[in-house]
Amino acid sequence: MSVPRIDGETSLVGLIGHPVSHSLSPQMHNASFAALGLNYVYVPLDVPPEELEAGVRGLRALGFRGFNVTMPHKERVCALVDRLDEAARISGAVNTVAVEEDGSLLGMNTDGSGFLLACREAGVEPSGRVALVAGAGGAAAAVAVALLRAGLSELRIANRTPGRALGLRERLGGLGGRVEVFPLSGLAEAAGGADILVNATYLGMRAGDPLPFPEELLRPGVAVCDAVYRPGKSTALVRAARRRGLAAVPGELMLLYQGVEAQRAWTGVDPDVGAMRRALSGEG
């Protein structure tokens, strides 16, 4: 990938989170900008929680065209933008912000649509199926919205704090499909009869993390999706699923497709998906 051209006309986009040093988003987006000849640059910005409000104000003041939002800021950013798209409003989480022509901030959620595109590339179709999502934070909420919109028959949410999962279930009302809540201690019960297992927790970000789903739950015919990715290697969950011959949707694929949707919102141009994919695989 060539070094981005930076001059007085360069449009700025980026990523805010804490931490951001592990992120592959800069490589991915800058590869597409270079391939398309767009005068944009994407920069990672480590913004601690206590500086989030000031950080968002600063990005607007500095003329950024948009930015991604990652953990732990996805939910708090909802209150810092001017309006939300439907996916962000229902999920209560923002992963992409676009600066509109009048300078207002549109909070979007492309995690869910990216998740669905990744599933379908891997041959996983949610319609009419039963899915178990571990986690009830921003990523889990976006995935839940996307699954129900895609015709899922039953969604099960397992979370360490049941109150948060119950709040998510309430927000999902009206999207169709049955929604049940389980404590993490009831993970085995929740997984019974599930066709799709989705990890939307932090587990897997660090080497040595326990599997979010015990190996005995990785039954024949189950599809496994991991929202977590580790630069340069598959997560333990994805490796375990593949060893058993199961369909596995890695976090890198979800990252790719949510990024495609985000970049299109910033530039109004279809991204170079091939360049983005090569950058994620280390070939760019």
Curated annotation (Swiss-Prot):
Tagged with keyword Amino-acid biosynthesis: yes
GO molecular function: NADP binding; shikimate 3-dehydrogenase (NADP+) activity
Pathway noted in the entry: Metabolic intermediate biosynthesis; chorismate biosynthesis; chorismate from D-erythrose 4-phosphate and phosphoenolpyruvate: step 4/7
Gene Ontology biological-process annotations: amino acid biosynthetic process; aromatic amino acid family biosynthetic process; chorismate biosynthetic process; shikimate metabolic process
Protein EC: 1.1.1.25
Annotated catalysed reactions: shikimate + NADP(+) = 3-dehydroshikimate + NADPH + H(+)
Stored InterPro entries: Aminoacid_DH-like_N_sf (IPR046346), NAD(P)-bd_dom_sf (IPR036291), SDH_C (IPR041121), Shikimate_DH (IPR011342), Shikimate_DH-bd_N (IPR013708), Shikimate_DH_fam (IPR022893), Shikm_DH/Glu-tRNA_Rdtase (IPR006151)
EC category name: oxidoreductase
Ligand binding (NADP(+)): E86, G135, A136, G137, G138, A139, N159, R160, T161, P162, G163, R164, A227, G251
Keyword terms of this UniProt record: Amino-acid biosynthesis, Aromatic amino acid biosynthesis, NADP, Oxidoreductase
HAMAP family: Shikimate_DH_AroE
Function: Involved in the biosynthesis of the chorismate, which leads to the biosynthesis of aromatic amino acids. Catalyzes the reversible NADPH linked reduction of 3-dehydroshikimate (DHSA) to yield shikimate (SA).
Family assignment from sequence similarity: Belongs to the shikimate dehydrogenase family.
Subunit architecture: Homodimer.
Identification of the protein by name: Shikimate dehydrogenase (NADP(+))
Originating species: Rubrobacter xylanophilus (strain DSM 9941 / JCM 11954 / NBRC 16129 / PRD-1)
Lineage: Bacteria, Bacillati, Actinomycetota, Rubrobacteria, Rubrobacterales
Record gene name: aroE
